[in-house]
Amino acid sequence: MSSGGLLLLLGLLTLWAELTPISGHDRPTFCNLAPESGRCRGHLRRIYYNLESNKCNVFFYGGCGGNDNNFETRDECRQTCGGK
């Protein structure tokens, strides 16, 4: 296979990996956790994965503690947990 063909194949595989939704089997278990604001009193806008709606929603994080279902962006949440 030529180098151009290999490059095309690599590009297609990368695109497929980005567009393939994450199944429940592949989703990290922390995506199933309810959002936790933590024990501090900050008011940071964060995103969590909502298992029931399969969406990445906003919550407010206190700044410390909490759990791993806590993302800075919706894109990060979607890439990790597969939400909409």
From Swiss-Prot:
Swiss-Prot/TrEMBL keywords: Disulfide bond, Protease inhibitor, Secreted, Serine protease inhibitor, Signal
Compartments reported by the entry: Secreted
Ubl conjugation as UniProt keyword: no
Entry annotated with the keyword Disulfide bond: yes
Domain BPTI/Kunitz inhibitor: from-to ranges: 31-81
Expression tissues: Expressed by the venom gland.
Membrane-traversing stretches: none
InterPro entries linked to this entry: Kunitz_BPTI, Kunitz_BPTI_sf, Prtase_inh_Kunz-CS, TFPI/VKTCI-like
Gene Ontology cellular-component terms listed: extracellular space
Signal peptide: 1-24
GO MF term set: serine-type endopeptidase inhibitor activity
Pfam families found in the cross-reference section: Kunitz_BPTI
Intrachain S-S bonds: C31-C81, C40-C64, C56-C77
Residues annotated as site: Reactive bond for trypsin: R41, G42
Function: Serine protease inhibitor that inhibits trypsin.
Family: Belongs to the venom Kunitz-type family.
Name assigned to this protein: Kunitz-type serine protease inhibitor B2
